[in-house]
């Protein structure tokens, strides 16, 4: 809105300017040129120039306003484009995440489908193997049935032979009515038994058909394990029926006994042939009875017709046998077939029990392996946590080393200030002695640092090996997880790998304990080195000055040391020469003459003793100053501060009611900038102050000051 107002003002000023110029032009044209003075022309020219300048300014302002408008529009368009781009980017990112999630879901589904396909293939292979076994069993059963058919054919031949014998007996027994009647009665009984046997065969055929139907149903439902139990129940019912059949087949021995009796009678009839001569005498009497025998022959013809009918039934039975595919012609064959079915059923039950037992064992092994995997993963997590704690401890130790180096530098500065107060005459022997001690300490520190660096390198190598082993363990865990997933599908995971993993875990635990001990030793050595003035070369940089007094002093000490070594060698040579009793070389005599006298040695000893006394005084002064500083802090703050353990400080108030009333603070940060109040018996009595000043305000000085005021008020009230 402000831009529109400015634009309208610019347009109005432009219009007024144009009107003014047109009026001036018209007025100027009406005037006479001769009457106008040159001064008025100059004024008009100046005014016209000013008006043109104003017009230019107004035009430039309008142009600037238009440019600013275009700029604002461009910025708005850029903002809109950015917003649209950000929206498009967010939508594309969301779509990408959705696509990634969908891909992951599809991958998981594909894996599940692959696993299901593998399981289905395994089940199909198992079913094919079972079908092959069933086919083999059926082939064996068909072979047995063929053998039984052969045995039935032999039995038919024997029956035909018996028929021939019966015909012979009829011709021989024509003259014996009583015997023929008995034979006829026996034949009738045999026919009845045959009828019973035919009925039993029909029932057996029906049962065989039922068994075939059950076999077909079982072959159709073998793919499903659950339906096997139902089939087993059906087979048990069939077994009960077969048992009933067995009870009926027990009657077969009685028929065999009757056959034996018939054979004995045939033998007896053979003997009767011998007595045929005697029977011929009775032939006349038997001719009278011929009419009766003719009637008997008619009955025999009827019996033969019935026999033919029975033979037709036998042939139809054999045809049914061939059409059904089961070679069962006798009850014995049926009993054998039933026994085979029972044996197959028992074998299937044994296989089922073996499969279930193996599945249970594999399931138990899988569960044990899963537990072992969980234990190994837990141990790995513990190892990682311990490694993190060790790294944190190493960082704390490094920070502590830095603090100790700072304290050492402060102590050196204090000692330097005390040394600066000494006179130059007293300073030089003390400096030389201190430089010697410093050089010895430097050599010791260098040697110790070399040892520590070697130990640190070994520890780092061992840590690297430990990390590699941890990585190997992680890879083995991943392999174990993949193997456990495959074991859940196929149950083929072995316990040997679990035992090896246990051994590896035990070895790693031993190595971890050993590394922890080495780490503790290294931490102790680092503390000692820090107390001795060592520093971390990777983090602390030492600057060496070109004209360093310490380097000059060291150079002098080295020169003095070399001179002293040369003098010692000369003195040793002198002693050897004197012991041998030979002449002393001139250079050794000169060296002996140049040695310091006993007075100089006594003076040097006095200087050393005075330096030691000065150091002792400095230590005493330092201790007294520290005591004074602590007393001043105690009187000023009202709290006595004592260091109990590492990073723990005990504060005892000046106005404490009991000597055991104290507060314990623990430094949570290495620099000591953050403190944490530990729980004590006295802290339970000041819970309100802790809640107000520490938890809400987070101010330890306010808490301590309020605590001193409260204790002071208690003492004054008391």
From Swiss-Prot:
SUPFAM superfamilies: Mitotic arrest deficient-like 1, Mad1
Residues where Phosphoserine is found: 16, 214, 428, 598, 610
Region called Important for interaction with IK, residue ranges: 301-340, 439-480
Reported effect, residue 556 to C: In a prostate cancer cell line; somatic mutation
Outcome when changing residue 360 to Q: In a prostate cancer cell line; somatic mutation
Motif Nuclear localization signal, residue numbers: 79-82
Family: Belongs to the MAD1 family.
Protein name in UniProt: Mitotic spindle assembly checkpoint protein MAD1
Lineage of source species: Eukaryota, Metazoa, Chordata, Craniata, Vertebrata
GN (gene name): MAD1L1
